[in-house]
Amino acid sequence: VNSTSSFLYPVAMLMDAGIDPARDMKQIILAGSHANVITALAEGRVDIGGASFDSFEKAVKAGSIDPAKVRVLAKSEPIPYPPIAMHPALPSKVQQQLKGAFNSVHETPGITPDQIRGYGGHKVDRYDANFPESGMDAPAKKMTRVNDQVKAAIIKKASDR
């Protein structure tokens, strides 16, 4: 219930569409991982599921799911990867050197695109050490709607089998 791309965002998107998952869904299964959600969809055990699109594409490429049999209903706006943070007491010069290194790693001799990875080991084309903190505001606001009360209601519904 704390996964951004397989729980918080999909639940928030349902809520944005006027759907209360705990009230409006006949049954809820908390599958536990993106791969489990995709497997449940592929096997017809669930009608809908939330997972990262990266995981869906990976499953399609691996032949784990037939895209002709599963329809993508919606995709969220891009979700920022978790930030890499540094302690504010670091000397300014060191902070700038670190930012510069991350911003230019994709141009570093000997570094290939396959070596640049983000959250969960997913390939990224580059890092952006200048991403403003305010860029996290909209995603944080969206996820805040899925509060402890909403989570508790969904967990309770999932336990009613």
Give the positions of each predicted feature.
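Sec/Tat-exported extracytoplasmic proteins
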Residues: A17-G18, G32, R45, V60-G63, ...
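Short, surface-exposed acidic
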Residues: P21-K26, P67-K69, Y127, V146, ...
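Short beta-strand->loop
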Residues: D24-Q27, V60-P78
